[in-house]
């Protein structure tokens, strides 16, 4: 098989949503319909022995939430699908942001009862900024929900993109009868309890004018007919170019927990979602079909297998072909990486990988050699851009009861910090480490993982700082003068980038006014080399 052929059959996408919209359930059902698993994990009954395939971390199983990104690969209809299930909790949106830099499309899940929620909107803004194509799945039609016309209007108005319904619901809640497929002009009938693999086939009705059909579904069908006529007259025609530009979204309705509407979404991902495209590096644009391998680390996960205390670097292949045993260079350090134990994923389950192509996600065992946003090549000096680190919005100090466990604490925080799940800052003065995060749950997860994965009982307490800005200057001497004058407010992050800490935004404003030669940044990119200026 040629590289061109293999690239064309790749589909790499992320599933995004507000917490509790049903994202993890839909992930499970996509795996089920693609034949990757034979029984979907029960997301609802988390205390049972069966858990969602994509929720592998112990705290996820205990609390029934996704706090880490999972990667799953499967084959369906001749295509290789790389599915990335992102954290559902808003405190982990930074991890989700990085995942979105590794995909070519996104599947947005909306709770039909709640519409477009805050986390959904934030993630969609990221997709829009990157012109990522978006397919929308309106979930939970088997419950009492909002009027579908209102939902469509809200999606269009809030997200600022044209909406093209591909299916339309007939009723909802206890009177949910199915969906009408507007492209194929047929109705798929819903049956309660369709949550078993052997029940995934649905009854199809092609003639909605049949008196028996009208009698069977009554007023709900009549209302759906009127809405369908309205949609046909008002909704724009589907435009593949507009979809690929992130300006138009196909919309599907269904109930993921009942396996209903999932098949249509999976088929549309194969038919309409784009194969891997060009990727921007500082030096030039990289074509996916280039012969030489290139890839970027978008995620690092510690302790995927706690028995081995391992760390895996998740790499999005941007061009060329991966071959087991090939020599890859880490552009940042110039060091070579061994590739004899590179793996592919089905969540925490992995298999040794012989070959992979642009668009695929591979896992490279990492012993500190790789960092987030590292570029890997066959020798070319390239640096991919767009993988961000955001300034924390909450700070806490961390201490341990047993000083003899200090080494384990440092190891744990170093590895968890490399994941990007938490940011660890070393103060210029003093020895108490600072943890920075965008949400409180991140601290809970870190203390839980320190205890269960590193054997460290850690205590966190609110710090006096609430804001941070990375600082740079054109003149190194000026930056050193600023650091010397503000030693009590300076800390260094995982890549030793100097950071100014503040309790109030006014303190940053004063510093900016008093030090015009210093730049204050809300965001940094790889190794502290690229910054976005903002106060």
From Swiss-Prot:
The keyword Cytoplasm applies. GO terms for molecular function: GTP binding; GTPase activity; translation release factor activity, codon nonspecific; translation release factor activity, codon specific. One of its GO terms (biological process) is regulation of translational termination. GTP binds at residues 17-24, 85-89, 139-142. Increases the formation of ribosomal termination complexes and stimulates activities of RF-1 and RF-2. It binds guanine nucleotides and has strong preference for UGA stop codons. It may interact directly with the ribosome. The stimulation of RF-1 and RF-2 is significantly reduced by GTP and GDP, but not by GMP. The keyword Oxidoreductase does not apply. PANTHER family: PEPTIDE CHAIN RELEASE FACTOR RF3 (PTHR43556:SF2). Its main location: cytoplasm. Keywords: Cytoplasm, GTP-binding, Nucleotide-binding, Protein biosynthesis. SUPFAM superfamilies: EF-G C-terminal domain-like, P-loop containing nucleoside triphosphate hydrolases, Translation proteins. It holds the Pfam family EF-G_D2. Belongs to the TRAFAC class translation factor GTPase superfamily. Classic translation factor GTPase family. PrfC subfamily. This is Peptide chain release factor 3. The gene is prfC. It is found in: Cytoplasm. Residues 8-277 form the tr-type G domain. One of its GO terms (cellular component) is cytosol.
């Amino acid at each position: 098989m040629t590289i061109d052929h293999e690239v064309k059959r790749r589909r790499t996408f992320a599933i995004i949503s507000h917490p509790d919209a049903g994202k993890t359930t839909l992930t499970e059902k996509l795996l089920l319909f693609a034949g990757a698993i034979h029984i979907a994990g029960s997301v609802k009954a988390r205390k049972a022995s069966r858990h969602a395939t994509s929720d592998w971390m112990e705290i996820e199983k205990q609390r029934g939430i996704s706090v880490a990104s999972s990667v799953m690969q499967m084959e369906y209809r001749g295509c290789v699908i790389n599915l990335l299930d992102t954290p559902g909790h808003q405190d982990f949106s930074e991890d989700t942001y990085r995942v979105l830099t590794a995909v070519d499309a996104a599947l947005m899940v909306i709770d039909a009862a709640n519409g477009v929620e805050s986390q959904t909107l934030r993630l969609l803004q990221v997709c829009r900024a990157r012109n990522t194509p978006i397919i929308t799945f309106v979930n939970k039609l088997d419950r009492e929900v909002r009027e579908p016309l209102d939902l469509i209007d809200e999606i269009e108005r809030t997200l600022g993109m044209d909406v093209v319904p591909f299916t339309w619901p007939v009723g909802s809640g206890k009177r949910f009868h199915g969906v009408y497929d507007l492209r194929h002009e047929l109705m798929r009938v819903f049956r309660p309890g369709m949550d078993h693999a052997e029940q995934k086939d649905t009854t199809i009705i092609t003639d909605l004018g049949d008196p028996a059909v009208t009698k069977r579904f009554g007023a709900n069908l009549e209302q759906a007919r009127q809405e369908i006529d309205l949609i046909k007259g008002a909704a724009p025609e589907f435009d593949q170019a507009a979809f690929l530009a992130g300006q138009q979204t196909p919309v599907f309705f269904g109930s993921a927990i009942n396996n209903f509407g999932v098949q249509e979404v999976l088929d549309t991902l194969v038919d309409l979602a784009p194969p891997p495209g060009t990727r921007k590096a500082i030096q030039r644009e990289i074509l996916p079909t280039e012969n030489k391998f290139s890839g970027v680390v978008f995620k690092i996960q510690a302790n995927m297998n706690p028995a081995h205390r391992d760390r895996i670097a998740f790499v999005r292949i941007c061009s060329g072909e991966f071959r087991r045993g090939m020599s890859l260079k880490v552009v940042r350090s110039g060091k070579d990486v061994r590739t004899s134990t590179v793996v592919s994923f089905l969540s925490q389950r992995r298999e040794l990988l012989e070959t992979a192509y642009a668009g695929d996600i591979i896992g490279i065992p990492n012993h500190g050699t790789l960092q987030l946003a590292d570029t890997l090549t066959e020798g070319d000096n390239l640096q991919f851009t767009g993988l961000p680190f955001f300034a924390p919005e909450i700070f806490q100090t961390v201490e341990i009861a047993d000083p003899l466990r200090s080494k384990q604490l440092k190891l744990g925080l170093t590895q968890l910090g490399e994941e990007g799940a938490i940011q660890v800052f070393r103060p210029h003065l003093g020895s108490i480490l600072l943890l920075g995060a965008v949400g409180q749950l991140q601290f809970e997860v870190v203390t839980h993982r320190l205890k269960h994965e590193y054997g460290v009982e850690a205590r966190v307490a609110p710090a006096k700082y609430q804001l941070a800005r990375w600082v740079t200057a054109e003149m190194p001497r000026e930056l050193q003068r600023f650091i010397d004058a503000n030693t009590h407010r300076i800390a260094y992050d995982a890549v030793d980038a100097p950071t100014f800490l503040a309790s109030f935004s006014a303190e940053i404003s004063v510093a900016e006014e008093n030090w015009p030669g210093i730049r204050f940044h809300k965001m940094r990119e790889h190794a502290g080399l690229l910054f976005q200026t903002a106060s």
